[in-house]
Amino acid sequence: MICVLVLQGYFGHSQTVTLPPSWTAAEQMASLLNEPKSPNRLQVETRTLIRADNNVLPLKLGDDERLPSMNFSDDYAYFANYRLKDFALSYRRWTLRHGYGKADFYDGNKDAAQLYLDSMSVGVDARKVYNVNASLNRTFLRRWTLEYAIPLKHNQGQISVALHWLRIHRLQKGKLTGQMWLGQFDGDLHLLTTRGLPSNEARGNGMTIDFSAVAPISRRIKFGIWGENVFSKIWQWNLQEITAKVATNKVEPDADGFLHAVPFLQGRIEKVSLKARAKRIWTIGAALQQGDNSWILMAKKERNWRISIGYSFPIGQRKQVWFMVSERPLLWQVAIITARFQFLLSVDKWNVATAKEAMTVVRYCWSL
């Protein structure tokens, strides 16, 4: 058990927190392909985003209690899970938005992934040495947004600035290092978590600013840039900081995504506060018009830069379809965009049994 409990008034950390996305790929594509609109009537919008992405195992197996035997061949392992649901009101240049979402991100080295796969399948190989290095970054929050759009060049482009106010209901950041050998795991755990605190103490606040600019640079080419969390500040007033020595012969994931160590876990808990910033995400894109059709080039920076190329064509008045393929790793995207409706589906493989990355976005709007 945890053997020392210390209460501390304030403790600062320089940390980066992962947040749900502000823009969807479908919205970014629509702004490149169409002229911006400032509704003269009150417009209502709702959107939903679900995304899961990893390089360890097929998504279909993610909730299975027992896995088939698998070998992990990469040097770096990760799992990302995002959910976003929000509701917006727009009038002319102003947009007011409210929603909630979560962002879960886990990463680690090759041995951390293999230890997880072995413990969930045939069992840990007692003769093998697993040198584990793993971390997690999780948030659940509500977000209020005020956005203002400035039209550019005869309303063919626009600059947008969005101010977000965050109410954080869950925050977890941690790191686990250690070695598994001869059926025994010995390591060090450092975890910042709101888990175990009363709900009124677990809440935090934050503020972020997003920026985007989309404008024509020639008669046929339009360029765009989107910056999420360009400026940000997050305050989590109450956290449990767990610093512990882990010694266990049983390995299984717990609710924090780390090890459930029974019965030996020695260390200390301190009550701390956290000042952090949100992780920045950058996207740049360009669309080359060819008659009614367009070629699209996009580059997005999350963990690394990911380049995508696509093609769009109309299927009716104010209706478009676009296809896109991304590299490293390969990702296929298809979307339908109309004046009121957007739907996007992206997968790395069309076979559900082997897909490791998938995203669905649905957006619908109407005027009052």
PLM feature spans:
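Boundary of Sec targeting at the N-terminus
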Residues: 10-15
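Loop-centered beta-sheet repeat module
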Residues: 170-243
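Transmembrane beta-strands of outer-membrane beta-barrel proteins
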Residues: 40-46, 87-89, 94-96, 157-163, ...
